[in-house]
Amino acid sequence: PLPKPSKAAKRQSKQQRGRATRLVMLEPRSRRGVTVQLGGDIVLGRDPACAIVLEDDAYISQRHVRFYDYDGQPMVEDLGSTNGTFHNGSKLVGAKLLHPGDRVQAGTTVIEAQ
């Protein structure tokens, strides 16, 4: 079965003003607090060539989701993953603008844009 959006992925932090500048991992607990600065292309997946490698998450594709800048704005897009990516609890279709407080779930990993 496919993973369902976790409660943490559905809960959004109070919307903040400004531009998201970093990604902070919330789940799983073993990665909680790990921070990645946004900028350029950041691909998350099981492939060792990814910027964020999650080899121990069975629900993650080799190249699962990409975070990138478009005209200076942080974006997120699913890369055709098998199990999908969720943005604020909804399945991500196409690319979406990332705002501070947005949550992205790929497999069992939940990341918050800050």
Predicted regions and their residues:
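Short, compositionally biased
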Residues: 113-114
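Intrinsically disordered, low-complexity acidic Ser/Thr-rich regulatory segments
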Residues: 1-56, 68
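Forkhead-associated
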Residues: 37-110
